[in-house]
């Protein structure tokens, strides 16, 4: 099935309306940042601010240019390293993204966001052993992190490792019970495992959180088969 198709469909409808309203204010903020930089071209904080607006507008190349300029002046700037890695990943420049995450971890050992970003990048780039090693290490360091457990569960789900994925989604939900994404993901995994009653419980829980039953119809229909 299309990955999280129903959940994303719900999100897209609301996001499209919201994005249309946000574009002009974002453009205005970007224009202000660019005008300020014209008078203060050496201000790193202004370049980081402009790059953040570029990211929100999905202007990946413009954002990368700003981070390149920052890092040419301050090669160890952690904010620029992290977000340039993110932008490089968006541009499918995986090796460059990996180098930025590794550099960030060199100057800030154990940084949660950099470790997570690197593990997810390795998964996307089909470095599966490195990805699992990285996410396992992150969970060992941050056993209370729902995000880390959910990230590992997503990797396991993509590899059709449904039983460990169910375990990890459950661990994530112990920490944030009302997270709709995690609960819908666990319902999907439970359907694959033919745990219909458990999957139904997750779907009903989502309805209790306010998710439309119509939006979950595809999942409910699978339980009838």
Which residues does each PLM region occupy?
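Canonical positions in the second alpha-helix
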Residues: 36, 69-70, 103-104, 137-138, ...
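Position-specific recognition of the canonical hydrophobic site in helix A of tetratricopeptide repeat
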Residues: 55, 82-89, 123, 150-157, ...
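Terminal, low-structured helical/coil segments at or just beyond the last alpha-helical repeat
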Residues: 24-28, 192-225
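Structural marker of alpha-solenoid helical repeat scaffolds
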Residues: 39-40, 73, 107-108, 141, ...
């Amino acid at each position: 099935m299309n990955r999280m198709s129903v959940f994303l469909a719900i999100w897209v409808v609301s996001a499209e309306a919201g994005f249309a309203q946000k574009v002009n204010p974002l453009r205005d903020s970007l224009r202000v940042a660019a005008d300020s930089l014209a008078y203060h071209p050496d201000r790193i904080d202004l370049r980081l601010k402009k790059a953040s607006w570029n990211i929100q507008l999905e202007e990946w190349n413009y954002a990368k240019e700003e981070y390149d300029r920052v890092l040419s002046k301050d090669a160890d700037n952690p904010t620029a390293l992290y977000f340039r890695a993110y932008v490089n990943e968006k541009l499918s420049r995986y090796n460059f993204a990996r180098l930025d995450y590794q550099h960030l971890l060199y100057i800030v050992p154990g940084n949660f966001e950099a470790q997570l970003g690197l593990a997810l990048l390795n998964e996307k780039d089909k470095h599966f052993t490195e990805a699992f090693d990285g996410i396992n290490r992150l969970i060992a360091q941050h056993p209370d992190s729902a995000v880390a457990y959910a990230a590992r569960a997503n990797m396991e789900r993509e590899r059709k490792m449904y039983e460990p994925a169910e375990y990890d989604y459950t661990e994530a939900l112990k920490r944030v019970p009302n997270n709709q994404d995690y609960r819908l993901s666990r319902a999907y995994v439970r359907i694959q495992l033919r745990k219909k009653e458990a999957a139904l419980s997750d779907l009903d829980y989502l309805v209790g959180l306010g998710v439309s039953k119509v939006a979950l119809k595809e999942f409910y229909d699978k339980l009838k088969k």
